[in-house]
Amino acid sequence: NEPLMTNPRVPFVLADQRPKLAPPDGKPLIVHFVVNIESWPFDSPPPRKILTGPHGVETLPDVPNFSWAEYGLRAGMPRLFKIARDRNLPTSAFLNAGAIDDYPSVAQAVKDMEWEVVGHGLKQKAVGDDEDEAALLKLCLDKIETFYGKRPRGWLGPGLRETNDTPDILASEGVDYICDWVLDDLPHWMTTKHGPVICMPYTLELNDSPMFAIQNQSSADYYQRYKDTVETFEKEFDNNPRILTIATHPHLMGVPHRIGYLEKLIDELLARDDTIFMTGSQIADWFIAADKAAT
């Protein structure tokens, strides 16, 4: 087989040449507030590290890095819950299905707050070559549906990772939108063997995981990046609305020295008259209707 030299699922188009979409409620800045809720296996290498092993020797269990993640669930999640609760924020939980059993009080709080639940794998681990991906994805979606009473409409792979089959499997399981393909500031249609699904904007540039765990940015840098992004988006509203994703992880954004910057950012966005907060499904429904009206 010849190598694919272009995107096999989302046709290429310049952002400023897309059909004009009517903004939701006349508000061109669409904010998607996301809380990633993950289950890191205790007996496996962690997905990310805050501390390397002494003398470069890594050991299992990796107690400090596992504890870093669990601190987020124990102490960081209450802070994120409070931000959303106090402001009545529409929120999407990108949930490892394994967290339902591993962290039942967190899973129940998400249910009580009526957050949208988006599939995010079973544990925070990409699908292995030796695994039955179709069975694993079905298990994740079924598990969430059983606990929350609603099948997830959206999906983000652990680490945004996929195989060549992932979108086809997700479409066959009824998933409407996929967040792994971070390639535009508005949704696109993605082709699958089972019909089109929505390629939903997410974020890497404004994601607390690469910013803090990889790039070692400061909290002030995080806040300024959002301010600078919105300033650019404002110049583009005449062309089309823009989606601003606030992607958080409790062990990163839920720590005491960062949470205040998140509160400040959200409060400033809430004070704008051109801004609307929406869940992933609300954005998907808006896009379906707006795209149909524009074509």
Residue ranges of each PLM-predicted region?
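Active-site-proximal beta-alpha loop/turn segments in soluble metabolic enzymes
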Residues: 209-212, 247-251
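Binuclear metal-dependent hydrolase catalytic cores centered on His/Asp/Glu-rich metal-binding motifs
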Residues: 204-225
